[in-house]
Amino acid sequence: MVPVLLSLPLLLGPAVLQETGSYSLIFLYTGLSRPSKGLPRFQATAFLNDQAFFHYNSNSGKAEPVEPWSHVEGMEDWEKESQLQRAREEIFLVTLKDIMDYYEDSTGSHTFQGMFGCEITNNRSSGAVWRYAYDGEDFIEFNKEIPAWIPLDPAAANTKLKWEAEKVYVQRAKAYLEEECPTMLKKYLTYSRSHLDRTDPPTVKITSRVAPGRNRIFRCLAYDFYPQRISLHWNQASKKLASEPERGVFPNGNGTYLSWMEVEVPPQNRDPFVCHIEHKGLSQSLSVQWDEKSKV
């Protein structure tokens, strides 16, 4: 058995792109040995940068583009993509079974995951990843510089032997990451650059609540912004306040992101509070003051 991506020839031809920038194409695969009722045994999602652009699962057997790519004609032959994903599904689940057989656990509930893809910067290949995990633990990864599969789990030594049974398998894996994947990404970018390069400014909402002990907690919520990077902090009387660390930036379910910052102050502190936001979608930093009338 050969690695997942080497089972079928690449379906896309060469493409040329002259513009500069950094972009990535990443595939995420998940296989389940005993899926719960209604859940697919195998799922795949492809991402352009951080934006999902198609899903596939074993229940439907179809690769289906998501918004806005579902309205883009010519980007991909989705029937051929469905055939490719069905072939990858079969090989992926065979690998999961092989691992379970190694551990003599043919009936257990286990998860096998894969992530692979590439990045281009200024129209040149600038990075790649190809690795797998079993039950949430690193299993095996491909090092394209050696090139070789690197076992990260006892069972992975057996997988390495199969995936390196012929030298050509390793060379094709290297070629996929360095040549074929970037070519595919460049083609996709001819249809996707405007969407990936967009800037959606954040919508900002400030709320407050009384915490135990009667201190007041102010929250500055920013949402519906893209790209992901954003800076939030609280000011009072032109002084930056000590506040809890950013909780992070989270997907908003619509291709944008949300984040928030909180600060806790004693009830006697009545000076105005201002939330400062910096984001690529804003022409200048945004300052939003807490309004007592909007208290919730």
From Swiss-Prot:
Gene Ontology BP term (one): cellular response to insulin stimulus
Positions annotated with a glycan in the UniProt record: N123, N254
Domain of life per record: Eukaryota
Xref: InterPro entries: Ig-like_dom, Ig-like_dom_sf, Ig-like_fold, Ig_C1-set, MHC_class-I_related, MHC_I-like_Ag-recog, MHC_I-like_Ag-recog_sf, MHC_I/II-like_Ag-recog
GO cellular component: external side of plasma membrane; extracellular space
Disulfide partners: C118-C181, C220-C275
SMART domains: IGc1
Statement: the UniProt record of this protein carries the keyword Ligase: no
Residues spanning the signal sequence: 1-17
Location in or out of the cell: Secreted
Alphabetical UniProt keywords: Disulfide bond, Glycoprotein, Pyrrolidone carboxylic acid, Secreted, Signal
Tissue specificity field: Expressed in liver, but not in a wide number of tissues, including prostate, mammary gland, kidney, intestine, lung, pancreas, ovary, uterus, thyroid, placenta, spleen, brain and heart.
Residues annotated as domain Ig-like C1-type: 202-287
Residues where Pyrrolidone carboxylic acid is found: Q18
Primary subcellular site in the record, as a coarse category: secreted
Family per similarity comment: Belongs to the MHC class I family.
Quaternary structure note: Interacts with PIP.
The protein's role, per its UniProt record: Stimulates lipid degradation in adipocytes and causes the extensive fat losses associated with some advanced cancers.
Protein name listed in UniProt: Zinc-alpha-2-glycoprotein
Record lineage: Eukaryota, Metazoa, Chordata, Craniata, Vertebrata
Gene name of the record: Azgp1
